[in-house]
Amino acid sequence: MSSNRTVHSDTSTLKMNSAVQISCLLLVLGCLLGSGHSQSEAEFAAKSREISQIFGNPSVDKYTKARNFPKLIAFYEKYSSRLHLTAQEKNNIDNSIKQYRAQQNHQVDGVSAQGGKLFDVLKKIIKVIVMVVDSTKANEERQKT
């Protein structure tokens, strides 16, 4: 009978070790995901400030804004799910980005087309994204306090 108890005890210990190992693994994964999320928060905040400083500042000239427009697109594509946009705003921005890329790919004498009607559309898009970025930052600041 004592051998039965030993086998049962060894099985219980093995199950307990597995449970402890799984718990430790889950704890480590939770910490990694949590720190990744906080890094993402810090990165989002830094990129938001950068976008606002370039595109939200009326003293920045249109050439600087045009030169940094790829940064704005990259920001939008990476963080669009965090920006509080209506379906219509998102659709308009997506369409404008497609038009912008098509225009950039269309070259005349080896030079991308510039300015024109699309630049006016992009100004509106920039205004919407900057407004949403600013309101998102303000909401996140309020939630911290």
Curated annotation (Swiss-Prot):
Where is it located? Secreted
Leader peptide range in chain numbering:
1-38
Q: Which domain of life is it from?
A: Eukaryota
Query: A single GO BP annotation from the record?
Result: response to bacterium
Pfam families given in the database record: Turandot (PF07240)
Keyword line? Immunity, Innate immunity, Secreted, Signal
Question: In the UniProt record, which is one GO cellular component term?
Answer: extracellular space
Write out the function statement from the record.
Answer: A humoral factor that may play a role in stress tolerance.
Q: Which family does it belong to?
A: Belongs to the Turandot family.
**Protein name, as recorded:** Protein Turandot E
Q: Which organism is it from?
A: Drosophila erecta (Fruit fly)
